[in-house]
Amino acid sequence: AGNRRPIWIMGHMVNAIGQIDEFVNLGANSIETDVSFDDNANPEYTYHGIPCDCGRNCKKYENFNDFLKGLRSATTPGNSKYQEKLVLVVFDLKTGSLYDNQANDAGKKLAKNLLQHYWNNGNNGGRAYIVLSIPDLNHYPLIKGFKDQLTKDGHPELMDKVGHDFSGNDDIGDVGKAYKKAGITGHIWQSDGITNCLPRGLSRVNAAVANRDSANGFINKVYYWTVDKRSTTRDALDAGVDGIMTNYPDVITDVLNEAAYKKKFRVATYDDNPWVTFKK
């Protein structure tokens, strides 16, 4: 049992504060939250909008900073709202509304908001690990902006809690080049997927897993989205993913409890560093 792969069950499109408890109570140890930006590259709402996944309400939202405060409560030990199981948050950054030259600025503004409203200026803030998920390889300067702002504000150590993802289903080699340009090594999650309304094969997941498991790969963790069926869950686990994003965390939980999967996998806890590649 000591060598089971830790799995992150990632609740999809958790954009209202009330949904945090809803998804964690169904078995999610991680959530994905959409972040929309205004014209000045300020994070504005936790909002997805239409269209979104089949069977979901696309329009739930909060003001970004309000959501961060709710998230902080849910991930701060001792808080009455604390959810011990919630250990990772993926911010799906909707930077498509921005010009490429605003990416750095968006990163700075995002960092300022997280520092104040989530990390409580470094004073016993939320403890979850954070993945900044960027849809466009050209927006890699967002990462530098984020890092520079935390450093400027005196909290470079918080980058220990921050990881990265490019979510555009780009060629894995091109993703690697973007990280080189950004000067990033480590803390890398690689997503692959499509809306639950459409089927998608696992060929790119297999490529990402192969990179992760190779001696000179740059990827630390691979996740697949959006998975709502038991059969797809099994296929993804068989392919060796580390995370599964879902609208139904209880479905993923059920599969992980099946005898064949219980032997090889377990639900990740706070003690599982999400930046460390799992070695079989």
From Swiss-Prot:
Q: In which tissues is it expressed?
A: Expressed by the venom gland.
UniProt: Mg(2+) binding residues = E32, D34, D92
Q: Which UniProt keywords apply?
A: Cytolysis, Dermonecrotic toxin, Disulfide bond, Hemolysis, Lipid degradation, Lipid metabolism, Lyase, Magnesium, Metal-binding, Secreted, Toxin
Identify which top EC class this enzyme belongs to: lyase
Q: Which SUPFAM superfamilies match?
A: PLC-like phosphodiesterases
Per its record, the protein catalyses: an N-(acyl)-sphingosylphosphocholine = an N-(acyl)-sphingosyl-1,3-cyclic phosphate + choline; an N-(acyl)-sphingosylphosphoethanolamine = an N-(acyl)-sphingosyl-1,3-cyclic phosphate + ethanolamine; a 1-acyl-sn-glycero-3-phosphocholine = a 1-acyl-sn-glycero-2,3-cyclic phosphate + choline; a 1-acyl-sn-glycero-3-phosphoethanolamine = a 1-acyl-sn-glycero-2,3-cyclic phosphate + ethanolamine
Which GO molecular function, any one, fits this protein according to its record?
A: metal ion binding
**Coiled coil regions, renumbered to chain:** none
Enzyme Commission code(s) on record:
4.6.1.-
**Disulfide linkage:** C52-C58, C54-C197
**Cofactor(s) named in the record:** Mg(2+)
Pfam families (alphabetical): GDPD_2
Q: Any binding details for the cofactor?
A: Binds 1 Mg(2+) ion per subunit.
Q: Where in the cell is it found?
A: Secreted
**Catalytic residues (UniProt):** H12, H48
Amino-acid biosynthesis recorded as keyword? no
A GO BP term here is:
lipid catabolic process
Answer whether the UniProt record assigns the keyword Lipid metabolism to this protein: yes
GO CC aspect terms: extracellular region
**Role of this protein:** Dermonecrotic toxins cleave the phosphodiester linkage between the phosphate and headgroup of certain phospholipids (sphingolipid and lysolipid substrates), forming an alcohol (often choline) and a cyclic phosphate. This toxin acts on sphingomyelin (SM). It may also act on ceramide phosphoethanolamine (CPE), lysophosphatidylcholine (LPC) and lysophosphatidylethanolamine (LPE), but not on lysophosphatidylserine (LPS), and lysophosphatidylglycerol (LPG). It acts by transphosphatidylation, releasing exclusively cyclic phosphate products as second products.
Family, similarity comment: Belongs to the arthropod phospholipase D family. Class II subfamily.
Name this polypeptide is given: Dermonecrotic toxin LsSicTox-alphaIA1
Question: What high-level taxonomic lineage is stated for the organism?
Answer: Eukaryota, Metazoa, Ecdysozoa, Arthropoda, Chelicerata
